[in-house]
């Protein structure tokens, strides 16, 4: 289980090795801090919106995770899922490495007990 909220150089290198002309869809699994985590994350959401817009990212889904239907346990470890599509891996990296984003990122880090970020690729059933 990772509790860090920073990417490593190896993770950035792996992301940059993906196709440069294909979107990357980031799946965020979010566990909020008990005391004010949800509120801090909403603040992050408001402040990150212009950064997402600047790089052409689109929020595809956001919602809570109240129960498992298939899987271990009655409830997943995360409280919410957020799915954001970036036009390219470079767009994501451009956003998260900008100085202006660093001021916003502090709210995300303060809001979460855990926040896994999984880089995925899209595919169709016929692929």
Predicted ranges, named:
Residues 1-81, 87-94, 121-127:
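Short S/T/G/P-rich N-terminal loop/turn motif that feeds into the first structured element of a domain
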Residues 94-100:
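Short amphipathic alpha-helices in soluble, non-transmembrane regions
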Residues 100-106, 112:
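A common structural junction motif
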Residues 113-117:
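Core nucleotidyl-transferase/polymerase catalytic module
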């Amino acid at each position: 289980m990772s509790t860090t909220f920073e990417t490593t150089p190896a993770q950035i290198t792996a992301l940059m090795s993906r196709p440069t002309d294909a979107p990357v869809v980031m799946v965020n699994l979010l566990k909020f801090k008990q005391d004010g985590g949800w509120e801090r994350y909403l603040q992050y959401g408001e402040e990150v919106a212009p950064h997402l817009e600047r790089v052409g990212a689109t929020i595809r889904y956001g919602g809570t995770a109240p129960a498992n239907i298939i899987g271990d346990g009655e409830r997943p470890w995360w409280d919410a899922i957020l799915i954001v599509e970036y036009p390219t891996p470079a767009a994501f990296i451009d956003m998260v490495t900008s100085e202006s984003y660093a001021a916003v990122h502090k709210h995300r880090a303060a809001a979460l007990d855990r926040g896994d970020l999984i880089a995925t690729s899209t595919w169709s059933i016929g692929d």
